[in-house]
Amino acid sequence: MEAANEVVNLFASQATTPSSLDAVTTLETVSTPTFIFPEVSDSQILQLMPATLYSGMNWLRDHLDGFSLLALSGCIFVSVLYLVHIIAFFYSIYRLHHKVEPDPTLPGVSVIKPIVGTDKNLYQNLESFFTSQYHSFELLFCFHSEEDEAIEVVRSLIKKHPNIEAKILFEGEPVGMNPKVNNMMPAYRAARYPLVLISDSAIFMRPDGILDMATTMMSHEKMASVTQIPYCKDRQGFHAAFEQIFFGTSHARLYLVGNFLGVVCSSGMSSMMKKSALDECGGMEKFGEYLAEDYFFAKALTSRGCKAAISTHPALQNSASVTVLSFFNRIGRWIKLRIAMMPHLMVVEPLQDCVTSGLIMAFGLNYLGGYSVYKTFGLHLFYWIVMDFSLMTSMQNGKFNFTPFLFVFIWLFREFTSPFIFIKAVLAPTIVWRNNKFKLSWGGRIRTSKNSQKVPEAVSLSKGAV
């Protein structure tokens, strides 16, 4: 209280000084003013506080019981989610869809494409890489088996584009329980260029996509990981619109805010890294024990002081076999992965969905101030859907190929089914991926289970580069 007394008394006290006659009696004498500070009690200090703050403290003391504190905390939590919407929208405008100019000084890129099976869009997706407008790159296609029907698709493209450096690598290398990492290992070892781009077979690449990612990579000397924010190429049909709306709203919101805050949220469907930086972390083989290898790539790099960022153009998923059921299974698999890697998300993740957060806000305000639950929940839904539509408009950067009515219908359906997807994922923690079943230990490591199918074994690179 001594410091507070000094501040108050500086303005409140009376000062006594020598008379002017005494001050001029001699030029050699300098009079120092003497201040007298009266004592001020704590109660007097409180009286100087703003009345609103003081009354607010009294209200909190008299009215904030346990349930009120819980309701207030819930309302604050949901208010933060409202802010997340705003940050995501404006950050998307700031970061996405910028034009990039060709730069021949950028490093070469080795594109690794792990492939299992085919669909009617595979040819289009793979050819988009053959036609990339980049001065120096190679394409490395990875297959577990020489019997894979997609091999003929790749061979036909290699024949059609003989000027593009491309290879087919078979059967992988057994470095862990993750079949995707095993599949990519020969390509990673054979990569000739400083930058490595891991791209899923269902990704359609814009002509300037590789250029965009390489430009972002070289924008900072410490940059070592660049990903494309997941989105979807325009396709016809309800199922495709369902997937596109999810990746343009709920997923995009968290991905953008995570990157804005510097949180690692890397997606492996289109991820570029500096090979030298990953080698310093132990190379790709070190991550064969993790199922979410993409996340742990970025985590290992950033833990060594490297930077991670998103490029300006989204990753355009273009699978021909998507259905609502397969989408639900995919989202459930991601939930299981996140919970295994970060167990605290088991509590936080379901609360940040639109429906659950709306109920928290509605009942919280009803308890604290008697506001209508229905009106509050309705306003919450309206705000959420308007902000989601605005964000998706920014992600799309053009016209939608579905009607606003379909957007509203799919959005409501997805939001109201989201809690059930989470519950199902928690109750059935085994992950089914391709033809394999996995169980994860805390931290994201793969552990074997009695019902696990055998992960395809791999052989050395000498078995084949075509």
From Swiss-Prot:
Expressed in excretory canals, pharyngeal intestinal valve, intestine and intestinal rectal valve. InterPro entries: Ceramide_glucosylTrfase, Nucleotide-diphossugar_trans. A motif (D2) lies at residue 200. Its EC number is 2.4.1.80. Disulfide bonds: none annotated. Pathway: Lipid metabolism; sphingolipid metabolism. The D1, D2, D3, (Q/R)XXRW motif is a critical part of the GCS active site, involved in catalysis and UDP-sugar binding. This is Ceramide glucosyltransferase 1. The gene is cgt-1.
